[in-house]
């Protein structure tokens, strides 16, 4: 597509919210002291897969991109651009983290360093492809500016590994589910980027496998009561974040022929099944209270967003402070209720799935 440079807008920052993609850092020295010998062969095998670079020639724009997109209505276009923006930011965040891990671990952990370097290659490729797609709608992210001016959220290494493993796996299930749906219903493919999701999601899957292999090399991350609590927490945090985000943007999923709630339920179920191959415990999604509580959280979150979007007199603003506090209280209360729902031991869960 030929762009009008006068209309192309460059965005340097993204709005920071509780649910927005973030940039992470960690204790690199702690990771450099890991003993990965117990699972070295699996880690090395995955790095060998990364070296093959199966998608080296995959992310090449074809002639289908060479057109205008004025047929997409304004609301759908806005929601789609938001989808591209969030996806690009998340991929770029992964690129920065993996690149820094590769740099910091190069001397002491060369195999891990190479794995992270090759994953950063994939993430950069994804982010660049998404940013070019945004340019088709006259918007780009200034990734160079974001690199220099990013704000970090610090996570301990074990939290990085739990969260990123799940993020990569849920990314896989999101991409492959959208791809399979649009293969069956091509009339809903509003933009050609969706054709790339089948091979794209395999990068996400391999990245998740790499994190799983590292976690397995550190038994303390999977053994004991405390580890079970952390696995439960990150499963819930990742699932709730996706659910609340997608409920905000339901019109986008409807525009490609998906029911946003059913899409999220399916992705959560499949990610939960994937996590059962690694984690000692997973969530009991058959408990009807699980999605009931998530729906309540989504409702409270929507009300909070509506308050922030309204311009109101000072008196109403004061009242809204208390109302927002009440809604946050309900959100936290429901999250706590979700956290303390009974979980499923993974040995019994695997038998149930089979």
Curated annotation (Swiss-Prot):
Pathway: Porphyrin-containing compound metabolism; chlorophyll biosynthesis (light-independent). GO terms for cellular component: chloroplast. It is found in: Plastid, Chloroplast. Its main location: plastid. Its EC number is 1.14.13.81. It comes from the Eukaryota. It catalyses: Mg-protoporphyrin IX 13-monomethyl ester + 3 NADPH + 3 O2 + 2 H(+) = 3,8-divinyl protochlorophyllide a + 3 NADP(+) + 5 H2O. Its cofactor is Fe cation. Keywords: Chlorophyll biosynthesis, Chloroplast, Iron, Metal-binding, NADP, Oxidoreductase, Photosynthesis, Plastid. One of its GO terms (molecular function) is magnesium-protoporphyrin IX monomethyl ester (oxidative) cyclase activity. Coiled coil: none annotated. The keyword Plastid applies. Catalyzes the formation of the isocyclic ring in chlorophyll biosynthesis. Mediates the cyclase reaction, which results in the formation of divinylprotochlorophyllide (Pchlide) characteristic of all chlorophylls from magnesium-protoporphyrin IX 13-monomethyl ester (MgPMME). Belongs to the AcsF family. This is Magnesium-protoporphyrin IX monomethyl ester [oxidative] cyclase. The lineage of its organism: Eukaryota, Rhodophyta, Bangiophyceae, Cyanidiales, Cyanidiaceae.
